[in-house]
Curated annotation (Swiss-Prot):
Organism: Thermoplasma volcanium (strain ATCC 51530 / DSM 4299 / JCM 9571 / NBRC 15438 / GSS1)
The protein's name: Small ribosomal subunit protein uS8
Summary of subunit composition and partner proteins: Part of the 30S ribosomal subunit.
Recorded GO CC terms: ribonucleoprotein complex; ribosome
Role, per record: One of the primary rRNA binding proteins, it binds directly to 16S rRNA central domain where it helps coordinate assembly of the platform of the 30S subunit.
UniProt keyword terms in alphabetical order: Ribonucleoprotein, Ribosomal protein, RNA-binding, rRNA-binding
InterPro entries per record: Ribosomal_uS8 (IPR000630), Ribosomal_uS8_CS (IPR047863), Ribosomal_uS8_sf (IPR035987)
Upper classification of the organism: Archaea, Methanobacteriati, Thermoplasmatota, Thermoplasmata, Thermoplasmatales
Length: 129
C-alpha cells in the first residue's frame, strides 16, 4: 500500500534524471500528480507527459529534460501565507530565482512565482531546481 503517491513520482523523476534516462512510467495517474507535472512542464523541468489510460488508476508517461538538479516532496505540507513564502524559498531552494516551489492554493496548483504575483498563499507540495 502506498502512502504518498506524489512522493513516489517525484523520487522516480529524480532517480531517472540522475541515471540519465529520458522517459519514465509513473503510477497512479492522480489529478494532483498531473497538476504538479503540468507546473514542472511549464517551467521546462520535464518535456512532456501523457496519461496512459489502463485499468486501475492509469499511469503517466513522463519525458524528462536534463535540467533537474534536485526535486523532492515537502512534508509535512506546511500552510504558507504569501508574505512567508520567502522563508520557505530560502529553506528549500539553493539560491534566489533558482528553482521553484510547487504549492496548492485556492486558485489551483501553481509555482511560488505565480502565487506571489497573485498575492495568495497555500500549502507547500514540492520543490524543483
Amino acid at each position: 500500500m502506498r502512502n504518498d503517491t506524489l512522493n513516489d513520482v517525484i523520487n522516480s523523476i529524480k532517480n531517472a534524471s540522475r541515471l540519465g534516462r529520458r522517459e519514465i512510467i509513473a503510477e497512479p495517474a492522480a489529478k494532483l500528480i498531473g497538476k504538479v507535472l503540468k507546473v514542472m512542464q511549464d517551467y521546462n523541468y520535464i518535456k512532456s507527459f501523457e496519461v496512459i489510460d489502463e485499468s486501475r488508476g492509469g499511469k503517466f508517461k513522463i519525458v524528462l529534460n536534463t535540467t533537474i538538479n534536485n526535486c523532492g516532496v515537502i512534508k509535512p505540507r506546511f500552510p504558507v501565507k504569501n508574505e512567508n513564502l520567502e522563508k520557505y524559498e530560502s529553506r528549500y531552494l539553493p539560491a534566489e530565482d533558482f528553482g521553484i516551489l510547487i504549492l496548492t492554493t485556492t486558485k489551483g496548483v501553481m509555482s511560488n512565482i505565480e502565487a506571489r504575483k497573485l498575492g495568495i498563499g497555500g500549502k507547500l507540495l514540492a520543490y524543483v531546481y
